[in-house]
């Protein structure tokens, strides 16, 4: 279940964990102090007839052989809100103030994972439905800097969009 697709990104001293549709100051994004450098990106997937993306793991290249996603711990201060059905990890200094607009043609074929527009300062995973949130798990080195991040897409809560419920709400508003 590990390393189904590995890529590299570069992160600075501050890293943003967010839905890319949000601006930098959105309450449901998280920013952490990270060990700067190259990070290996891994999809954690359940393989089979219909592969399912279970999580996204980034680990500093110096720790790649030492740290697994199961070594990360929940950071209760980060509630990663998801509105666009996407969630990612980005270098805070390069993340646009008003969020990222993506071209859907950049999506990967298997698990809808793709990089940020300039190719090296972040990674986004998508195709999760709509509104909700996901847990961010962190690993910190001896200096307290984050050197690995695991986004768990199996433990999040997001409500499925209910067309009938929405239509009923719209009808009620029209009647008033």
Predicted features and spans:
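Intrinsically disordered, low-complexity acidic regions enriched in Pro/Ser/Thr
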Residues: 1-176
């Amino acid at each position: 279940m590990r390393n189904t697709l590995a890529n590299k990104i570069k992160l600075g001293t501050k890293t943003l964990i967010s839905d890319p549709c949000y601006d930098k100051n959105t309450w449901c994004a998280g920013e952490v102090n990270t060990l700067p450098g190259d990070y290996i990106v891994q999809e954690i997937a359940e393989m089979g007839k219909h592969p399912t993306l279970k999580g996204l793991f980034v680990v500093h290249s110096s720790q790649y052989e030492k740290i697994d996603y199961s070594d990360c711990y929940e950071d209760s201060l980060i509630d990663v809100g998801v509105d666009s059905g996407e969630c990612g990890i980005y270098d805070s200094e390069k993340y646009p103030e008003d969020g990222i607009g993506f071209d859907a043609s950049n999506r990967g074929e298997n698990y809808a994972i793709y990089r940020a527009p300039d190719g090296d300062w972040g990674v986004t995973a998508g195709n999760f439905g709509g509104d909700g949130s996901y847990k961010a798990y962190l690993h910190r080195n001896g200096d307290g800097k984050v050197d690995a991040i695991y986004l768990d897409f199996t433990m999040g809560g997001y409500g499925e969009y209910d067309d009938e419920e929405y239509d009923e709400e719209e009808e009620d508003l029209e009647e008033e």
